[in-house]
């Protein structure tokens, strides 16, 4: 495991701005509204001599009656427990506050390196005023402007000296990236917390509690995973608030980053138009998919209930008919272990490669038993097929009519490959290509 560095401090002191600065691009949502970052957000920072994992946290308020702020404080405390080094950030514009003093007193009891940072030092006056922070009794105080990149590299030089050696996973071990997506308030964060075994993400009945896409590294059955809990995706017309628009874009980017996407559905509401839209994003991105039908405990059941709900999902998502369906209750934990089993199964298929000889055997049988429709009155000839990539598996089929293959025949070939090679939980892609004139002569597949 690479060393962990936690950013902690009051709300709106610039933790997410520094997080994005060190990452090299915007990942955490940055806004003037306090409490925009509500959970622990992880990112691998590999732009410096020593790679490390940076944890961005929600604001830390030592004393509060607000339940959401209490949950954010708990998330910050967990981040401090996980971290090898803590960066405690304060705000030069606000000056030293009683909350800063409370956090500093708590950090004195932490037996790990703490770096005290005053952010938003954007001019000489603020530089002079920041001297008051020395009253905390610290020897080294870093004055920076994360927004303008002032003092950040000096901070990084000293941080790298404090980092322990990487005790990371064995070489060659790959991390499966899992995105959790769905409409607001279908139970995504509750599912994440259930899978991880502790409250990793702020789960709240209020729709939109998760605003950032929150990354969590974890181990399951001795295998590493990166779990991405996304903000709920709403209809475009309903994302009027600026932060909501940021979050939807971030959720779509999370789908692009993932290997496997868990599409969480609410069993009590059935399949909605917005569910179909979200699943469409997953399909277009070409990611492996598992449908997680949550709140199954709230459904009254008889012998036909299971089959009826399977039919509802299959009817609503015809283009994802290959994706497995898991019925769970994130609240009670019912069948949630099946989720990771399904992730492993579809990931194996998502990464599977078949030999060219086996592929062409199936390809020849498929084109011989069912001929392609004529294209512009001409017979379609197929020459051979080869797999060019995985994740998702992609095949190139060479033919004399690459631009005239009917989509129904493409679907037929995909289904033949799926059945023959066990690609039951992953999208498949076929590219039709003409023979290059300079390539060796090849005979068409027999009887096609």
UniProtKB/Swiss-Prot annotation:
Residues 3-167, 176-351 form the EngA-type G domain. Keywords: GTP-binding, Nucleotide-binding, Repeat, Ribosome biogenesis. Residues 352-436 form the KH-like domain. It comes from the Bacteria. GTP 1 binds at residues 9-16, 56-60, 119-122. InterPro entries: G_ENGA (IPR031166), GTP-bd (IPR006073), GTPase_Der (IPR016484), KH_dom-like (IPR032859), KH_dom-like_a/b (IPR015946), P-loop_NTPase (IPR027417), Small_GTP-bd (IPR005225). GTPase that plays an essential role in the late steps of ribosome biogenesis. Belongs to the TRAFAC class TrmE-Era-EngA-EngB-Septin-like GTPase superfamily. EngA (Der) GTPase family. This is GTPase Der. It comes from Pelobacter propionicus (strain DSM 2379 / NBRC 103807 / OttBd1). The gene is der.
